[in-house]
Amino acid sequence: LGISPKETMSIAQKLYENGHITYMRTDSLMLSDDALEDIKKKVNKEFGEDYYQETKYKSKDKNSQEAHEACRPCKFSKHTLDGLENISYRENRLYKLIWTRTMMSQMKPAKVEITSIKIGFKDEDDKVSKNNFVSKKEFIVFDGFLKASSVYKKSKETKEEEQVEEEEPEIEQVEKDGKKILEKLKKDMDCSYVKIQASQKYSRHSQARFTEASLVKKLDELGIGRPSTYSSMVSTVQDRNYVEKKSIEGKEVKLENIKLENDEIVEKEDKTKIGGDKNKLFPTPIGEIVNKFLIDNFSEII
């Protein structure tokens, strides 16, 4: 959603106070029997009985405090709060996300068909090379829980969302065209190239800097804090100037692209920027000093 943890909890608090969602400061995965029954009715009515699958979740975290239900909508009949007074754009977006994820939790998994295509070639001695061009294509056979996202996208809220919805038919057409191409392919058939293009790419660093959201996820994985404290923890390290949220521009690098077409090799040079970060958390000099002090003196608990 592009919303900070602090603002997310503030928005969730308003939704809770207005009776739209249940208590949000919980790490429980449990849903009440009444809620499960209401979800079942909604899924069967909205998507059909083929999409419903009852699932009862249990937290794997031994320290989980399941005193409340999982955060969920109070009324499953409302997938959006559009039209209600005093409901902001962001409040509606968060509510719709909670509604969608809750519905998905009681729906069948999606089924995907994966087709792999390998194109080999012969070397100068007319021997088949061990190297292959490999391509994989996924087709959704049964959309399952993904069907709930179609309801999430029903209302057009921004020009950006309108553009996405306008592009969907084109995406569906690409899927259909892709299937038609695959149907024409046969095992061991000969094929000739029309164009072969190789483009230079730079891989991203495996350990990216934290965003506020990814930091919360990491805290949860490490068992540090609780849902009620994540927001304040992320805010505190920024308020104390241990870290700062900022964006940095990447450096410009050259890319070499090679194209083989009509038995002619064409080399082209492009430029791109790498190493940039947007809205990431960076340690400050104070943060680095505090971190070193903690490691030197409290290494056994860090």
Spans of features found by a protein language model:
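Core catalytic DNA strand-manipulation module of type IA topoisomerases
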Residues: 1-302
